[in-house]
């Protein structure tokens, strides 16, 4: 069977489960947003990788999110492949822009959920500057 998307899926690579949950959290805090399109190539830290000085407040949110994920990777309890931030699923609720991580999450899921929650709330508090989307990474992120 062949699946065809009219939404430009060829532009968006398949996303691990946790990143899809992070996407949903951003949609909760910023209704009407398209996180996979808007944030995957923003500044120096939003999307894959990250280096240099963040270009603005939104990019700082992404750097803090990256740093948060780095902390969970250092926790020996969360070092198995099932617990890495990009694939570990967690439970949370969204109500009118408010995000709550479930008390039922295990230690690793709780940490990852809180990383994503903090970043999604941060995104909602800072401006999105179109000029920092798809910047020249090599020259501006040193």
Curated annotation (Swiss-Prot):
Keywords recorded for this protein, A-Z: Calcium, Disulfide bond, Hydrolase, Lipid degradation, Lipid metabolism, Metal-binding, Secreted, Signal
What GO terms are given for molecular function?
Answer: calcium ion binding; calcium-dependent phospholipase A2 activity; phospholipid binding; signaling receptor binding
The protein here is known as Acidic phospholipase A2 KBf-grIB
Q: Whose protein is this, by species?
A: Bungarus fasciatus
Which residues participate directly in catalysis?
65, 116
Task: Give the transmembrane region(s).
Answer: none
Q: What is its EC number?
A: 3.1.1.4
Kindly name one Pfam family recorded for this protein: Phospholip_A2_1
Tissue specificity annotation:
Expressed by the venom gland.
- The cysteines joined by S-S bonds are 28-94, 44-141, 46-62, 61-122, 68-115, 78-108, 101-113
Q: Does the keyword Acetylation feature in the UniProt annotation?
A: no
Give the EC class as a word: hydrolase
Q: Which GO terms describe its cellular component?
A: extracellular region
Q: Which InterPro entries match?
A: PLipase_A2, PLipase_A2_Asp_AS, PLipase_A2_dom, PLipase_A2_dom_sf, PLipase_A2_His_AS
Q: Where in the cell is it found?
A: Secreted
Q: What does the similarity note say?
A: Belongs to the phospholipase A2 family. Group I subfamily. D49 sub-subfamily.
Q: Enumerate the Gene Ontology biological process terms.
A: arachidonate secretion; fatty acid biosynthetic process; lipid catabolic process; phospholipid metabolic process; positive regulation of fibroblast proliferation
Q: Cofactor(s) for this protein? A: Ca(2+)
**Briefly, what is this protein's role?**
PLA2 catalyzes the calcium-dependent hydrolysis of the 2-acyl groups in 3-sn-phosphoglycerides.
On cofactor binding, the record's note says: Binds 1 Ca(2+) ion.
Q: Where does Ca(2+) bind?
A: 45, 47, 49, 66
Catalysed transformations (reactions): a 1,2-diacyl-sn-glycero-3-phosphocholine + H2O = a 1-acyl-sn-glycero-3-phosphocholine + a fatty acid + H(+)
Origin superkingdom: Eukaryota
Gene3D superfamilies from the xrefs? Phospholipase A2 domain
